[in-house]
């Protein structure tokens, strides 16, 4: 509630003004949302000292004395709507900044949009609410200059102390600049915090060239996580929030939903960071802003693969199964995605991808020893019959009518079990016959799939019900020798086919997150630093450099 003593002084100030020429009368009783544009082209600017109420967060300004009010009739303090509009148009035409928020700001004022931040009372607490957030951006590695904080604060000070004149500090020029910069900073901040200041799909899906000729260039898909981006409706809503005096509420609502964001900010708050640490913080905070449709924090049970860590974590409540993993090389990077593990296949056959056939197999066309050594066979797609490797040409191997398949069992490149999930890259999580990879520090060795150190333990984790009989069958199937006996080979233990299992549904499906963070906490909240194995921090920083301190 407004203080009664102060109310009396407001009325006295109004009475003083009321004694002036009718040309300069302002009606104090009207809402501050009645913008300058609704008044005559020249109105007296005096209410910059007044504050509408004393609610929490409002800025209390000194009451005008009779001497001060008398000075307000001077030309220096007159607000002229047409002059403000002209200045706004000049600012919009001179603005060359390229963010979507910037273009929305330009369009809004060039189209004659309502004044949002300034009115006959000057500039109220909404500007202070915005500045309170903008003054914290250095905690996330950003510079205040990106949001024109210095200029906004100087102009607010001029208005609130009447430090204006008829020259370069002309009140209409200052007010127009305040209006424009507040809107631009507001849209930049709210859109960036809510959706991210960068678009990961544009950045990472235009990074690695797949094919290139004189006509076109195609790129590998490296980022396939669905992220929301700001729409026209978002910007319209944001501007409406300013107009309706809901700035503070909206600023709280647009903060990142990812729990990791708050952890990163808290971990580095108040610390003196090296340049490398600052860049790492900047990049990982930005990743945590990208507005995904799903997050690990939404689930009690899930599988997380953080590529730079070279580890897979299977998490259920407070229980964590951790294992080493190997991922794609620099040329065949593991794509980032969210999915659900739906099925596990035991002793799978491997249908070799065309890219691998082209790179590694086609040179051995007509060499049956190579195919036998790798336990490959060739299948005619239309007839379903096997083709003698001795009769296969390079052209046939490259023809989609023929498959090259590796037999399941011991020695298969997929190992003894593969975990299937929907994705656009034909990748999966699997066991491997190349166990040596897990002894390496750098484990970027695959064609894009994820190889795991503890496949049986992961299989058990994924089961909805821990059925002992089923677990025994999976274990037995993963150890049974299913290969054909070779001539002269000693008699081996007979396979018990009743204990074999080929495919097991994961019910319910388990969420899978394949992500990329060079700063990431463990389940206890301790932050860990990882090498930038794919160089994604460097790529992302090129887009964030202009924002940095």
What are these regions (language model features)?
Residues 164-171, 209-239:
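Short His/Asp/Glu-rich catalytic/ion-coordination signatures at enzyme active sites or charged loops
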Residues 24, 53-102, 108-110, 187, ...:
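Well-ordered beta-sheet/strand-loop patches within structured domains
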Residues 1-65:
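Bacterial Sec-dependent N-terminal signal peptides
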Residues 54-211:
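Cationic-aromatic interfacial patches
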Residues 4, 18, 47, 102-103, ...:
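Generic detection of intrinsically disordered/low-complexity segments and helix-coil linkers/edges
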Residues 182-206, 215, 221-225, 234, ...:
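Surface-exposed interaction patches
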